Structures are given as structure tokens and as C-alpha cells.
Amino acid sequence: MANRSAAKAEALAQELDCRAVDNAAVAAGADYIFLGVKPYMVAGLMEKIGPVLAARKDRFVLVSMAAALTIPDLRERGCGDWPLIRIMPNTPSAIGEGVIFYTCDGVTAEEEAAFLENMAGAGRLLPLDDHLMDAGSAVAGCGPAFVDLFIEAMADGGVACGLTRPMAMECAAQTLIGAARLMLETGRHPGALKDAVCSPGGATIQGVRALEAGGFRSAVMEAVIAAYEKSAEMK
């Protein structure tokens, strides 16, 4: 692995039990070369490693994590005609609970299968058309920040009602995890699960009423759309 900071590369190499090298060494020998740079840095990186890649006689796959850059954008910035996978991971990937959207171009079925096998530990890998990657990123890439804000607000409510901060935070986070897993594992619509908790005249439906009065659904939708529109501006 390589990093702009040699010290950071060494630290990460020790943590991940791999070798710290420079970009040229990665470009010369890796089967899957991850381009983990900001969008504006892709062209400069490819200008440096392009000659090394061009000299290779074996197949390799470029994997881009640059937000907002489509497959054509990446090719215009130096990725040429080489096999290319565009991915959009999110922060929970760090603990194996991520959502990783991906789209392939010029990649064989065997190369895609090997990529999926090696990335399986990061979370759920979902194929997505290139033109929809920004939409996926607005939900899964930006979503953790929205969810964190919700957890913090829910915990604040718990504190206001008398819970300690640690208890309220743990309770809010675990409740979100449990509700999400219940939906995923049962396949039930979230609206149906919500209705199952809302007893007639009960406390939950009053809380739902307060959320609706505050524009909760609209605010969440607008957050996703705003993130999507910003991604479009970043191209």
C-alpha cells in the first residue's frame, strides 16, 4: 500500500499487516489498484502512474473511490481503456457494516467475482448503474451523518427525560440498529413496522405525530436531495 505520507503508510501497513511502498510499486505489481484520492487529484495521480501501468503486460483492474466522477470522467482523467471499477463505500465499511455501491467497465466476470470476494468483509456490495452512483452516495455515503444526527437528537430527548448521557446514547444507537435489522431480516416495509408499534391512543403515535408536525420526512428527503445535487456540482 502507498500513501502521500510515508509515516502514515508505515503505520497503516503495520496495522493491516502489509508492506508500505510507493505509488509506482503499487501500480507495477497490484492486481487491483485502488485510487483513494479526491476527485481533483485523479488526473495528477494517473499522470504519474500511467507510464508504469502502460508498461505492464499482465491484466490489472483500477478501482476508483473518487466521489462524483463517472466512468467516462475517470477515463478522461487518465484511466484510459484499462479495466475499471468505480465504487462508493461509506464509513461503516471500516467495521464490516458498510454499503458499497459498485459499477464495472471492461472487467471480466472472474475479475468481478474476485473483487467481490475480497471486498466482502467491508459489508454489502450492491451493483449500481454508473449514472445512479451519485443517488446511491446521497443515501449510503452521506446517510451515516444523517443517522448520527438522528441518534444524537434522540439521545438528547432521552437526557431531557432523565436518562444519563451514556445510557441515552447507547439506547438510541442500539434501537436504530435493532429496527434496521428487523426490517432487513423480515423484509417487512418500514411503514408496517412503524404501525405495529403505534397502539391506538398510545405514546408512540403521539411521538410520530410530533415528528410529522416538525416536517421530519420532508427534512430527511431534502437532505438526501441536497447531497445528491451537491455531488452533481462537484464533477
Where are the language model's segments positioned?
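Rossmann-like NAD(P)(H) cofactor-binding subdomain of soluble oxidoreductases
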Residues: 6, 15-16, 23-100
